[in-house]
Amino acid sequence: MSEVITKSNTAPKVGFVSLGCAKALTDSELILTQLSAEGYQTSKTFQGADLVIVNTCGFIDDAVKESLDTIGEALAENGKVIVTGCLGAKTAEGGGNLVRQMHPSVLAVTGPQATQEVMDAVHANLPKPHDPFIDLVPNAFGVAGIKLTPRHYAYIKISEGCNHRCTFCIIPSMRGDLVSRPIGDVLKEARALFEGGVKELLVISQDTSAYGVDVKYRTGFWDGKPTKTRLLELAAALGDMAEPYGAWVRLHYVYPYPSVDDLLPLMAAGKVLPYLDVPLQHSHPEVLKRMKRPASGEKNLERIQRWREVCPDIVVRSTFIAGFPGETEEEFSHLLDFMREAQIDRAGCFAYSPVQGAVANDIGGMLPIELREERRARFMAVAEAVSSAKLQQRIGATMQVLVDSAPGLGKKGGLGRSYADAPEIDGVVKLLPPEKISKTLRVGEFTKARIVGAQGHDLVAQPF
């Protein structure tokens, strides 16, 4: 993030660091929008800042360490630090706030989705400018506000929190139970994003499939029309809205409830991308029971096969955990067999990490870290073989590619993504120089490209 908005040379400056997942990123965007609306300058560096805000992650141990280290660096370089995010809600082993215990000199600590609390702390330590010409309300920037992503794609969070209590996860203790955003608010933000040039909208939450469950799918309103607060209606409305802009809508964190089947016709019709990010975590029924996964009784293999019958182009992405407490070699082999048979297009895998506060730590049967890592490596070898074979099948096909990078207007090629590739987590399409000398590639625009090769998780394509 470069300096976001400069109000004046004398406006107080806030350094800002955003760590963690896409959900945390949207929290950062809300805070940055409010800061800018009130006349503060913002910067991604500590130098020259009057204070620093660190939005933290507290899910796994590596993320906790990164967050604590970043807070320490900010204190050392600047001295005035406000901490927000998931780590801010975490309790230390002996009780008390973990951040306060490790860094007692921070100015304030809040949990996630706490824009007002963060702003209160900023006001207490760095009074806002009182200039009527720059002291704006957030809507002056458009409802979409400031975004930390490139201009051509954006995340939109449709709910906060989660009603599930998976034994490996501590997110509900930090972000609370499911709270769905009013459907009218979501669609208003989406329209502002499309109007602002966004070509790919990535729908995120902790549990996208559960959107509206907490409000019993009550009817909201959009453009004066009644619209049910439910994922199917939201996806359909987003697809209709995106169409005039030629934009993509991509769904993430979609739990495999039966209701997900209703989305497939929208994908087959091209309303939303035929791409499902489904966090399955494992395949063996006993492991899923120990994980207390929602929809653990679903026959996921049959579900995926049925999805492909309805929408042959669908790409299924998922994440898995290897070495969960008590996992036997038979249970792990079941997972490998599932990967081969389900042919998951894009897969990630984590070796189980005993996150502080997770119920799974007390299940018993903790596996040695060496075995957990060995199983993760074995899983990824299978996943990469599946992915490579599926990418080879695309050679010779023509695909629409969203250009992410194109130095010199693409005269020497560039990088982009197809519908099968979400930013940051999937592969890319390596673009060769266009066939025609007159053709240019521009970031944020689509190009047709012929797939000519595959390299690892990536495709190689010739724009035309």
UniProtKB/Swiss-Prot annotation:
Cofactor binding summary note: Binds 2 [4Fe-4S] clusters. One cluster is coordinated with 3 cysteines and an exchangeable S-adenosyl-L-methionine.
GO molecular function: 4 iron, 4 sulfur cluster binding; aspartic acid methylthiotransferase activity; metal ion binding; protein methylthiotransferase activity
Residue ranges annotated for the Radical SAM core domain, each copy included: 148-390
CDD domains according to UniProt: Radical_SAM (cd01335)
GO biological process: tRNA modification
Gene3D superfamilies according to UniProt: Methylthiotransferase, N-terminal domain, Nucleic acid-binding proteins, tm_1862 like domain
Main location group: cytoplasm
GO cellular component: cytosol
Span of the signal peptide: none
Co-factor(s): [4Fe-4S] cluster
Catalytic activity: L-aspartate(89)-[ribosomal protein uS12]-hydrogen + (sulfur carrier)-SH + AH2 + 2 S-adenosyl-L-methionine = 3-methylsulfanyl-L-aspartate(89)-[ribosomal protein uS12]-hydrogen + (sulfur carrier)-H + 5'-deoxyadenosine + L-methionine + A + S-adenosyl-L-homocysteine + 2 H(+)
Stretches assigned to the TRAM domain: 392-464
EC number: 2.8.4.4
Alphabetic keyword roster: 4Fe-4S, Cytoplasm, Iron, Iron-sulfur, Metal-binding, S-adenosyl-L-methionine, Transferase
Residues that hold [4Fe-4S] cluster 1 according to the record: C21, C57, C86
TM ranges: none
SMART domains: Elp3
Catalytic EC class: transferase
Family annotation (PANTHER family): RIBOSOMAL PROTEIN S12 METHYLTHIOTRANSFERASE RIMO, RIBOSOMAL PROTEIN US12 METHYLTHIOTRANSFERASE RIMO
NCBIfam families with a match to the protein in the record: 30S ribosomal protein S12 methylthiotransferase RimO (TIGR01125), MiaB/RimO family radical SAM methylthiotransferase (TIGR00089)
Summary of the function given for this chain in its UniProt record: Catalyzes the methylthiolation of an aspartic acid residue of ribosomal protein uS12.
HAMAP family: MTTase_RimO (MF_01865)
Stated name of the protein: Ribosomal protein uS12 methylthiotransferase RimO
